[in-house]
């Protein structure tokens, strides 16, 4: 994610593992729990990750001081991320910072213990953030072919995490055809609970509407757009204003007149004949067969 050089975002890496932090590309790296773990990992124990974060509360507060918005991202199920993420998010929210969690759930083949840890961590993190976007790794298997290797699958998970963050921050930080400010984003993300993300890419004459259809039907959403009360949309690429209007109207028709839809659009001359659309849904009315995966 650091390599993508996302505009307006400062990265902070947090880990108990001293050796792992040496490979961290974030300009700021914080080792937590040195007294507790002696510079080693958390041993896949979330309680160790939690105590490690509590050991370095002042360092964590200093790292996020002055931020308007904090994203807490990690892969749930292990020790450090699962245990420390709710602590870090709680600090940010207590400081009055708009706090968004973007996390992955492990593949089911990683075992019951790791999945149970992830479920518990997600529940705790949900109480500590304004909005929580959960990306189930199992659903990524529907987006790749059978020949995809494990490293490639994990890279895909990282790409979705990156797109979730960038899809939000670019709306604020990059001037475009339709601009949003921080207050707009805050409206649809402050105290909203669980959210879902869909991403669509398309080319051709109908690229905008095609990308939107792919995004709103993405398996990552684990739900349908009908009944969503808040919808945040980022349309980026080689796109015209009429194409933006067509795609936005399609979403409005699906979500209904009562949905609060906020969207921004940026033109990228380097994205020749390609459009990428990120859709984030929150406060979804649950009805059969819609379900939330937690």
Where in the sequence are the language-model features?
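Tubulin/FtsZ superfamily GTPase core signature
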Residues: 1-287, 291
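Nucleotide/phosphate-binding catalytic cleft detector across ATP-hydrolyzing
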Residues: 294
């Amino acid at each position: 994610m650091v390599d993508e050089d996302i505009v307006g975002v400062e990265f902070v890496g947090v880990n108990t593992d001293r050796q792992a932090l040496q490979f961290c590309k974030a300009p700021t790296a914080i080792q937590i729990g040195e007294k507790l773990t002696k510079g080693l990992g958390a041993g896949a124990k979330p309680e160790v990750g939690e105590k490690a974060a509590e050991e370095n509360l002042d360092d964590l507060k200093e790292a996020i001081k002055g931020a308007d918005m904090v994203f807490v991202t990690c892969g749930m199920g292990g020790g450090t991320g699962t245990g420390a993420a709710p602590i870090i998010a709680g600090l940010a929210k207590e400081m009055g910072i708009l706090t968004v969690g973007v996390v992955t759930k492990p593949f089911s083949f990683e075992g019951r213990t790791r999945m149970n840890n992830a479920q518990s961590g997600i529940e705790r993190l949900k109480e500590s953030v304004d909005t929580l976007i959960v990306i189930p790794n199992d659903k990524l298997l529907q987006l790749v072919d059978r020949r995809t290797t494990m490293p490639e699958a994990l890279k895909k998970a990282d790409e979705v995490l990156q797109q979730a963050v960038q899809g939000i921050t670019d709306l604020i930080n990059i001037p475009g055809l339709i601009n949003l400010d921080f207050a707009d984003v805050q409206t649809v993300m402050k105290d909203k609970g669980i959210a879902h993300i869909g991403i669509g890419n398309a080319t051709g004459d109908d690229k905008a509407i095609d990308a939107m259809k792919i995004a709103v039907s993405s398996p990552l959403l684990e739900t349908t757009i009908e009944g969503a009360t808040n919808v945040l949309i980022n349309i980026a690429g080689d796109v015209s204003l009429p194409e933006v209007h067509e795609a936005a109207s399609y979403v409005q028709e699906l979500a209904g007149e009562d949905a609060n839809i906020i969207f921004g659009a940026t033109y990228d001359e380097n994205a020749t004949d390609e459009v990428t659309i990120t859709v984030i849904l929150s406060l979804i009315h649950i009805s059969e067969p819609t379900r939330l995966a937690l």
